[in-house]
């Protein structure tokens, strides 16, 4: 999710780290217009909240518009964007189906997330969850993956994420 014109990008911790929790040696970023930015810098990453900020060498990116996740209600329409299964710019739609759900990451730390029924799959992580005005209201992060469950995805609310993101940048 492009945060600023000067190259700050929001994503998930688990997107920029390996199994040992260390940042990948090389992170390349491809934007919607096909431009590839090589060797992005990990500015900060927080395992407990599954958030990370990276920076690419750019001066004129088009940042996303950010909304207010605290105003979301059950049943609100949302859109999830990502690279599900390696398929670039996959877009799925759904509704907000839960608020402030505790999602436990590998650390055992609970992250308060929005529950959505839009398809969230491997490759969607770090992508935006948009409201009906096209504003980012969440960061796609996880899903329940079990044979008996379908359509239970989770997104970190942008209001809570912004506090962590600002700390990671400073």
How should each PLM-predicted stretch be described?
Residues 3-5, 131-132:
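A cytosolic small-molecule/anion-sensing beta-strand core signal
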Residues 4-89, 162:
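Conserved active-site neighborhood of the chymotrypsin/trypsin-like protease fold
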Residues 13-26, 61-63, 81-95, 100-126, ...:
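Active-site loop architecture of trypsin-fold serine endopeptidases
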Residues 1-3, 41-44, 97, 121:
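Conserved positions in beta-strands of structured domains
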């Amino acid at each position: 999710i492009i945060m600023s014109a000067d190259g700050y990008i929001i994503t998930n911790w688990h997107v920029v780290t390996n199994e040992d929790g260390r940042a990948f040696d090389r992170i390349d970023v491809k934007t919607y217009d096909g431009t590839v930015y090589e060797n992005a810098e990990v500015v900060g990453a927080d395992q407990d909240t599954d958030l990370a900020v990276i920076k690419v060498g750019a001066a004129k990116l088009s940042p996303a518009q950010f909304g207010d996740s605290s105003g979301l209600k059950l049943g609100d329409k949302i859109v999830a964007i990502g690279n599900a299964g390696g398929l670039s710019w996959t877009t799925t739609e759904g509704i907000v189906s839960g608020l402030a759900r505790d999602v436990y990451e590998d650390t055992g730390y609970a992250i308060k997330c929005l529950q959505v029924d839009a398809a969230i799959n491997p490759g969607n992580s770090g992508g935006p969850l948009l409201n009906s005005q096209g504003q980012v209201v969440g960061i796609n992060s996880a899903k329940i993956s079990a044979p008996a469950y379908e359509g239970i995805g989770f997104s970190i609310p942008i209001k809570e994420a912004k506090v962590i993101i600002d700390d990671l940048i400073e």
